[in-house]
Curated annotation (Swiss-Prot):
Entry's Gene Ontology BP terms: protein folding
Protein name (database record): Foldase protein PrsA 2
Alphabetized UniProt keyword annotations: Cell membrane, Isomerase, Lipoprotein, Membrane, Palmitate, Rotamase, Signal
Membrane protein topology class: Lipid-anchor
Family: Belongs to the PrsA family.
Location of this chain's protein in the cell: Cell membrane
Lipid group attachment sites (N-palmitoyl cysteine): C21
Domain of life: Bacteria
Main subcellular location of this protein, as a coarse class: membrane
Lipidation residue positions, type S-diacylglycerol cysteine: C21
Length: 293
């Protein structure tokens, strides 16, 4: 959850609240002068208005063409919750978000994702080319500890016959996975720390266990639970398509999709103060229009 995104969301919510209140009135009184609701609204509109109106507009445009269910949002929400483990509530609080406001942002992100996927070429020709270098997802468990000595201690216990799941519960500092034996969600290439990914994919058989692997998070011992199994294009096509679509969810492709959706929606900005809000999507600005007069 990047700070810039969170700050923008919080400011947009505040701007919406001010707009909903309407009317004048003071928000701050001093002997030197008062700060009115209108002054605060204008200041926030000037600083955050473009970002706010962009998201509201695209929510309307994309929501009319693509459907994101409550179940879709809840699934993504639970993924984040699992990723952050016991720290999730604290992260939301520190970010000035509630579960409701975070889910609102997730819904918008999923709308952009669905639109991008709908505008992506998934012909057999494209997918077969991608299949040449594609690797299936794998499922592994890991035990994460802070230092190498502790990792070697755990490694020795495994060699002595102790169960991986029991040691994960006892030693792992990954609170999101330790209680389920350290098992991670399935992942493919490019999804994990490079050193972790290399060590995981080097395990070829179920039950294989790695030596301690150092990453930015500490030291991992990895167990292969479900190795990669590549069969034929026809049998793997569904997984290949899902993987390819995910690989195409780049900032560049999403921006290209939003430009297309914006053009198709025949958008007209009526507020002169927000004329430049969509300049990145229509290639123009109010200053361009003024200079051409």
């Amino acid at each position: 959850m990047k700070k810039k995104l969170i700050l923008g969301l919080v400011m947009m919510m505040a701007l919406f609240s001010l707009a909903a209140c309407g009317g004048g009135g003071d928000v701050v009184k001093t002997d030197s002068g008062d700060v009115t609701k209108d002054e605060l609204y204008d200041a926030m509109k000037d600083k955050y208005g473009s970002e706010f109106v962009q998201q509201l507009t695209f929510e309307k445009i994309l929501g009319d063409k693509y459907k994101v269910s409550d179940e879709d949002v809840d699934k993504k929400f639970n993924e984040y919750k699992s990723q952050y483990g016991d720290q999730f509530s604290a992260v939301l609080t520190q970010s000035g978000l509630t579960e409701k406001s975070f889910k609102s942002q997730l819904k918008y992100n999923l709308l952009v994702q669905k639109a991008t996927e709908a505008n992506t070429d998934t012909s057999d020709k494209t997918l077969k080319k991608y299949y040449e270098t594609w690797q299936p997802d794998i499922t592994v468990s890991h035990i994460l500890v802070a230092d190498e000595n502790k990792a070697k201690e755990v490694e020795q216990k495994l060699k002595d016959g102790e169960k991986f799941a029991d040691l994960a519960k006892e030693y792992s500092t990954d609170t999101a996975t330790k209680d389920n034996g350290g098992q991670l969600a399935p992942f493919g290439p490019g999804k994990m720390d490079p050193a972790f990914e290399k060590a995981a994919y080097a395990l070829k058989n179920k039950g294989d266990i790695s030596a301690p692997v150092k990453t930015q998070y500490g030291y991992h011992i990895i167990q292969m639970d479900k190795p990669a199994t590549k069969t034929t294009f026809e049998k793997d096509k569904k997984a290949v398509k899902a993987s390819y679509l995910e690989s195409q969810l780049t900032t560049e492709n999403m921006q290209k999709t939003l430009k297309k959706e914006y053009k198709d929606a025949n958008v007209k900005v009526e507020d002169k103060d927000l004329k430049d809000a969509f300049k990145d999507f229509d290639g123009s600005s109010s200053s361009d229009s003024d200079s051409s007069k």
